[in-house]
């Protein structure tokens, strides 16, 4: 695995390897939402907010479902019948949504993933989309999300090289603070032949931006 990716993964996943604190009950989570509603200055007992704590907790189960998923389950099977394919596999424009770990507000965009398969075979295309969701459905930074996705691919598929680019708009920048709507953040990471050969990076970017080239 690429040393840069490994270093970032060690920092971003260290908290996941520690013993998890006891998870509050559903009732405790709903009570916490009610406290926040009162903190905003609103009345949780009014009709429009009466069921909001339950709805928020249910939504959080979906938003953060990645904590209950394992990348190894998604990447454990490859298609050996395409053994011998040695060119790039690229999946473009994979939509994702995540939540910033600093403000717990959404960021969303698309992921582009390219890799050169190893002799073991190729992964199902839908598996790459599922992999993105596993890590996106957690509290994240875009940089860590980028590293975690490519790190999982490197670890489980051991490709000859992998390239990833994430493009996202962050609501913590659009809705608060500087409030710059429409601003995009791009992150990239390369391993193997992509890291060692700038021409492969150019090819990856070209296929992402102009797939007919």
From Swiss-Prot:
Its EC number is 3.5.4.16. It comes from the Bacteria. Zn(2+) binds at residues 100, 103, 172. Signal peptide: none annotated. One of its GO terms (biological process) is tetrahydrofolate biosynthetic process. Keywords: GTP-binding, Hydrolase, Metal-binding, Nucleotide-binding, One-carbon metabolism, Zinc. One of its GO terms (cellular component) is cytoplasm. Residues 1-27 are annotated as: Disordered. PROSITE patterns: GTP_CYCLOHYDROL_1_1 (PS00859), GTP_CYCLOHYDROL_1_2 (PS00860). It is an enzyme of class 3 (hydrolase). Belongs to the GTP cyclohydrolase I family. NCBIfam families: folE, PRK09347.1-2, PRK09347.1-3. This is GTP cyclohydrolase 1. The gene is folE.
């Amino acid at each position: 695995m690429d040393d840069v990716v490994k270093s970032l993964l060690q920092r971003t996943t260290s908290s996941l390897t520690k013993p998890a604190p006891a998870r509050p009950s559903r009732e405790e989570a709903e009570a916490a939402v009610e406290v926040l509603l009162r903190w905003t200055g609103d009345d949780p007992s009014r009709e429009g907010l009466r069921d909001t704590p339950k709805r928020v907790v249910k939504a959080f189960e979906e938003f953060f479902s990645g904590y209950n998923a394992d990348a190894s389950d998604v990447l454990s099977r490859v298609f050996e019948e395409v053994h011998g394919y040695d060119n790039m596999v690229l999946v473009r424009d994979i939509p994702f949504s995540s939540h910033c770990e600093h403000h717990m507000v959404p960021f969303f965009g698309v992921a582009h993933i390219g890799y050169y398969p190893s002799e073991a075979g190729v992964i199902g295309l839908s598996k790459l989309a599922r992999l993105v969701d596993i890590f996106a459905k957690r509290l994240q930074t875009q940089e860590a999300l980028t590293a975690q996705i490519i790190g999982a691919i490197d670890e489980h598929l051991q490709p000859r090289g992998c390239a990833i680019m994430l493009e996202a708009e962050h609501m913590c920048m659009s809705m608060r603070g500087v409030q710059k709507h429409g601003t995009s953040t791009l992150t990239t990471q390369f391993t193997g032949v992509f890291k060692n050969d700038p021409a492969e990076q150019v090819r990856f970017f070209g296929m992402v931006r102009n797939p007919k080239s």
